[in-house]
C-alpha cells in the first residue's frame, strides 16, 4: 500500500466510522456526530482530488475508497433507521426504512458484483463511474442534513434530509441498474 496523502485520507475515513457510531450511540452532541460525518464526506472528495492532482492514484486507493464510503454510509443509515427518535419524526417511517434497505442492499450487491467481475477479469465493466460518484455525494449530503436536523430537530431540515435521502435512493437504484446492465453480457454467459 503506497502511503500517499490520498490513501491516508481514505484510511482516516475508515477510522472515523467507529468514532461516528460511538458518538451517536452514547448520545453525544448531535452536532459533533454530524460534523464528523461531514468531515468524512470532505475526505471522500479530497482523497480523489488529491490522488488525481498529485498523480498518486493507486490500486489500493481505488479499492478502499468506495469500500470506505459504503461502510460509513451503511453504518450511519442503520443508526438512523434504528433510532425511534428519527423514525417517529420523518414523513414516512416505512418509506424511510425501505430506502435505507435499498441503499444498503445496493451497496452489498454492487460490491459482490465487482468482486465477481474481478474474478472473471472484467472489473472495468463495473468500475466507479460518474453516476456512482453523484450517488455517493447525494447520500453523504442527505445523511449530513439528516444528522444536523436531528441534532436540532428542525422540521424543515429534517424534511429536506428525508427528501434528499429519497432522491439518493432513486439514484442508488438507477446506478445499480446501470452497473447490472453493463455486467449482464458476462453474467448471462455464466
Identify the role of each PLM range.
Residues 2-10, 14-16, 21-22, 27, ...:
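A feature for the membrane-embedded catalytic helix bundles of lipid/isoprenoid biosynthetic enzymes
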Residues 56:
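Conserved hydrophobic/amphipathic secondary-structure segments
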Residues 33-41:
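Short hydrophobic/aromatic, small-residue-rich stretches within specific transmembrane helices
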Amino acid at each position: 500500500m503506497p502511503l500517499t496523502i490520498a490513501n491516508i485520507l481514505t484510511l482516516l475515513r475508515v477510522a472515523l466510522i467507529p468514532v461516528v457510531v460511538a458518538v451517536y450511540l452514547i448520545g453525544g452532541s448531535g452536532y459533533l456526530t454530524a460534523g464528523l460525518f461531514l468531515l468524512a464526506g470532505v475526505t471522500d472528495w479530497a482523497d480523489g482530488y488529491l490522488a488525481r492532482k498529485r498523480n498518486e492514484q493507486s490500486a489500493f486507493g481505488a479499492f478502499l475508497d468506495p469500500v470506505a464510503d459504503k461502510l460509513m454510509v451503511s453504518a450511519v443509515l442503520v443508526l438512523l433507521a434504528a433510532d425511534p427518535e428519527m423514525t417517529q419524526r420523518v414523513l414516512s417511517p416505512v418509506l424511510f426504512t425501505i430506502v435505507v434497505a435499498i441503499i444498503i442492499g445496493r451497496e452489498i450487491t454492487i460490491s459482490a458484483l465487482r468482486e465477481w467481475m474481478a474474478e472473471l477479469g472484467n472489473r472495468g465493466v463495473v468500475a466507479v463511474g460518474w453516476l456512482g460518484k453523484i450517488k455517493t455525494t447525494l447520500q453523504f449530503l442527505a445523511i449530513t442534513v439528516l444528522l444536523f436536523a436531528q441534532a436540532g430537530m428542525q422540521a424543515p431540515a429534517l424534511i429536506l434530509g428525508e427528501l434528499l435521502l429519497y432522491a439518493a435512493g432513486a439514484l442508488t437504484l438507477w446506478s445499480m441498474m446501470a452497473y447490472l446492465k453493463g455486467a449482464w453480457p458476462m453474467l448471462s454467459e455464466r
